[in-house]
C-alpha cells in the first residue's frame, strides 16, 4: 500500500478507538498514529522514513561525539547532568533506542522485521518505557494496521520474522486500483470521524 493509504487507515482506526476530547489530545493521536503508520516502511530504501532515520542516526552520533569531546575538553559530564532530570532522561532513553532500532530496521529487507509481530512489540515496548498510552496506543494501533494492510499485498510480509515465510492474501498491488479505492474510502471515513470528534471538543 502507498504511505497515504497507511496514514489514512492508521488515523481512522486510532481516532475511532481513542476518541480524543481535546485539541492537544487530537493532535497527539494523529501525530503518534502517523508515526506508527509510516515507521514500518523505514525498510523501504530511499523512502522518506528511511532518509529521516538516517539523518536522525547521524545527528545522534554527532551528539554523542560532541558530548565526549565536551567531557574531555571541559570536564563537563552532560550525561550525568541530564540524568539529574529523571523524566527528561527517560524520554531521551526511549527516543534514542527508538531511533537506533529504526535505523537498524531500515537495513533489513522490505516487509521483514518492521512488518513482523516481533518488530511491532519491540517498537511499542521501547515507547512504553517512557511515554503514556496517549502516544503508545495510537502508535501500536497504526503500526498493527500497517502490517495487516500489507498482508493484502501480493508480495506479502515476514509476519513471523526471523522466519522467512511470507504471509500474503494476494488481493492487491501496492499502487493498484484496490489501493486507490481503499485510500478514498478511508479518507472519507476519517473526515467523518474527525467531524464527529470535533463536536465534542
Predicted regions and their residues:
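N-terminal membrane-targeting hydrophobic helices
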Residues: 1-201
Amino acid at each position: 500500500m502507498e504511505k497515504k493509504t497507511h496514514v489514512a487507515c492508521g488515523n481512522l482506526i486510532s481516532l475511532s478507538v481513542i476518541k480524543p476530547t481535546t485539541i492537544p489530545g487530537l493532535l497527539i493521536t494523529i501525530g503518534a498514529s502517523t508515526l506508527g503508520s509510516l515507521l514500518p516502511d523505514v525498510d523501504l530504501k530511499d523512502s522518506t522514513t528511511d532518509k529521516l532515520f538516517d539523518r536522525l542516526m547521524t545527528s545522534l552520533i554527532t551528539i554523542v561525539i560532541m558530548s565526549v569531546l565536551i567531557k574531555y575538553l571541559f570536564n563537563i559530564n552532560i550525561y550525568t547532568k541530564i540524568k539529574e532530570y529523571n523524566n527528561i532522561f527517560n524520554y531521551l532513553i526511549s527516543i534514542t533506542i527508538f531511533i537506533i532500532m529504526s535505523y537498524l530496521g531500515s537495513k533489513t529487507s522490505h516487509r521483514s522485521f518492521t512488518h513482523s509481530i516481533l518488530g511491532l512489540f519491540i517498537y511499542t515496548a521501547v515507547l512504553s518505557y517512557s511515554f503514556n498510552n496517549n502516544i503508545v496506543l495510537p502508535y501500536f494501533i497504526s503500526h498493527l494496521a500497517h502490517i495487516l494492510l500489507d498482508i493484502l499485498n501480493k508480495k506479502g510480509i515476514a509476519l513471523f520474522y526471523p522466519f522467512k515465510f511470507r504471509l500474503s492474501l494476494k488481493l492487491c498491488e501496492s499502487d493498484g486500483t484496490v489501493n486507490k479505492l481503499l485510500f478514498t474510502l478511508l479518507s472519507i471515513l476519517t473526515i467523518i470521524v474527525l467531524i464527529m470528534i470535533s463536536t465534542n471538543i
